[in-house]
Amino acid sequence: MANIKSAKKRAVQSEKARKHNASRRSMMRTFIKKVYAAIEAGDKAAALKAFNEMQPIVDRQAVKGLIHKNKAARHKANLTAQINKLA
């Protein structure tokens, strides 16, 4: 454990940020999984609805720095391609 006051404060802040980031990351993954589940079921309407709910969440996490913008773009591109294949 840290002895210096500022180091103790940073440890507390880091733990708080870690928990917040874990929560946001989990939420984002849940939205992505909903899209994959709809694709697996072969339901294009449900997949589009889930994708439209997921897209702003992923974009927001990229802007906030939780994930890289290229990772957000990759998720969206891959899911869009899979949804378009459903016909």
Curated annotation (Swiss-Prot):
The gene is rpsT. Keywords: Ribonucleoprotein, Ribosomal protein, RNA-binding, rRNA-binding. Binds directly to 16S ribosomal RNA. Residues 1-26 are annotated as: Disordered. Belongs to the bacterial ribosomal protein bS20 family. The lineage of its organism: Bacteria, Pseudomonadati, Pseudomonadota, Gammaproteobacteria, Enterobacterales. The keyword rRNA-binding applies. The keyword Nucleotidyltransferase does not apply. GO terms for molecular function: small ribosomal subunit rRNA binding; structural constituent of ribosome. One of its GO terms (cellular component) is cytosol. Gene3D superfamilies: Ribosomal protein S20. Disulfide bonds: none annotated. One of its GO terms (biological process) is translation. SUPFAM superfamilies: Ribosomal protein S20. This is Small ribosomal subunit protein bS20.
